[in-house]
């Protein structure tokens, strides 16, 4: 039963991660297909570039929540269903491995969207949501570093590299 619950959660988190929020928001609010404008990516950075600040931030928050919300709920309830098996086999890995696999699931969904011909974004916001669920201090620090360097330099790619480097320097 435990493996069935795990499989259900893995698939549910994958499907949740597969929702192409940038694509949906772009089509709903400005009738723009992010796949055909800007960088062609459906993630928050291209949404910011093509749709503007308000909608780009909304896409970031929704993509962030695709990682943060399910993993936070899972971590909260894991003590009830993730027990250490009496005998470890490949089919019954330890709880840490199960949580790690569940954390990867929305990332895979975002990158290989079931609703977008298995194409998606880079899963940066979703990954930040997962990191924040595991360790809020690290996640929030990364977001703050990113915001500072995005404001200073105006390039999301450069801000991402600097933010991830600084997070590793301070917490790695």
UniProtKB/Swiss-Prot annotation:
It is a multi-pass membrane protein. It is an enzyme of class 2 (transferase). Its EC number is 2.3.1.275. GO terms for cellular component: plasma membrane. It is found in: Cell membrane. NCBIfam families: glycerol-3-phosphate 1-O-acyltransferase PlsY. Catalyzes the transfer of an acyl group from acyl-phosphate (acyl-PO(4)) to glycerol-3-phosphate (G3P) to form lysophosphatidic acid (LPA). This enzyme utilizes acyl-phosphate as fatty acyl donor, but not acyl-CoA or acyl-ACP. This is Glycerol-3-phosphate acyltransferase. It comes from Onion yellows phytoplasma (strain OY-M). The gene is plsY.
